[in-house]
Amino acid sequence: MTSKNTLIAMTMIALGILLALIGYFSGGRWLILKDSEGLYVPSNTKLVSQSYALDAFTSINIVNDYGDVEIVASGRDFKLDTKVLEQADVTYHIDNGTLTIETMAKKKDGFQFGFGNLSSPSIKLYVPKDTKIEAIVIDSNFGDTAIHGLQYQQLNLIQDYGDITFNNTTGDRTEIRQSFGDLTLQQLTSNGFTIESEHGDIDIDGTLNGQSTITSSFGDTTLHLQNKQSDVGYDLKTDFGDVTINDEEQSGTVTQVTKGEHQLNVSLSHGDIDVSLK
């Protein structure tokens, strides 16, 4: 039988995690850490910065334990900039055209969270402008993910805690699974699109061609699309919330059947759906 002290300890830990997450999503940054021994404040919160010139690569694989991840298409060079608690937390290598980056805390049996007035640990990857990446795989635990100006064939992004931001990106196939955080995609063009979100708002501005599927448990979904309404078949439904198409509020499940190849499916448990089409 679980002792009273154990129950109290578990409750306090859960409360600490909840408060830390609230602080993080309110704009806070890393300060309190947790490992198998419990909560602690790191003795050194100063970030170590380093820049690495990289050889060319065609695919990207990122496994991120903590910190923000940013990929930018800019200039003519392949480059990696890092800001982490310890330089040993970041490793990278290129094998058969695939760049693999891993960021892991020194105490690998724990995880990190917290809030305070600190700069965010981060990795920032630069690829030459107009480069088309074959495949991108990102598995991120804590931290925001941002992609700017990138072209890719396939992207698979798994994000546990943190916001996701895309700007001016083009992809043949995009798959995103997010647990906690908002998703904002601006100037996006995709030919196949899948989003699974548990908690957070979804805001997309761009063109969704082919089969596009969005499912969410909690949060609103807003789509400002450049597609013509007559070219898109759609199936929009929310269990608790409103559905609006081109500023016209409708109730229940809203569908349109077309013979074309472009299909949009949005299914929410709790939240509003707002879609605008040309």
Language-model regions, residue ranges each:
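Short, surface-exposed interaction patches in beta-rich subdomains
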Residues: N168, T174, L183-K278
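Short, polar loop motifs at secondary-structure junctions
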Residues: L85-Q87
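Right-handed parallel beta-helix
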Residues: N44-S59, D68-D77, V90-R177, D182-Q186, ...
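A broad, low-specificity signal for short, low-complexity segments enriched in glycine/proline
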Residues: Y24, I32-L33, Y40-S43, T58-D65, ...
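Alpha-helical transmembrane segments and their membrane-interface anchoring/capping motifs
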Residues: M1-D65, E70-S74, K132, N246, ...
